[in-house]
Amino acid sequence: MSFIKHSRAKYVILSDCDVVTNIDYKPIVAAHIESGADITAVAHTGVYSSDDIKTSTVFNVDADKKVTSVLINPAISGTCTTSLNVFVMSMDFLIETVNDAMARGNVSFERNILQEKCRELKIKIYEYDNYFSKLNSPESYFKSNICLLYTSPSPRD
């Protein structure tokens, strides 16, 4: 926590290591700042099989892309908005959230922050439409990295 508290950064990006993509964070941070959100979650809306979703976090969102509920590892399929496990927030919000979680014995960002507090926090979605792949096996790791070599990212302004 000492490193975080002494950082001069105003915003922080939290990212898991189970997604392969080539992502430019600048427009995501800019969208986060513009929206005034507590947390901005990078997500993709698409049609998914139950196998694709069973290890994912799924967001229900309103017309303004505000998260209204969070499902963790749901047994669903079809069109849904799934998390890429990339989140933007202010450094101050992160420190406050971590301190509160530690005081309460909370250990899960998805369950204790996103799911439990989605109605009291302003959690917004940044819709990501470029190539990504979730990793859940050695085979998916290999296939995803090969695909990334041959998939050119869409240009962004």
List each model region and its residues:
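Unchanged
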Residues: 1-146
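Conserved small/polar residues in nucleotide/adenosyl-binding loops
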Residues: 150-157
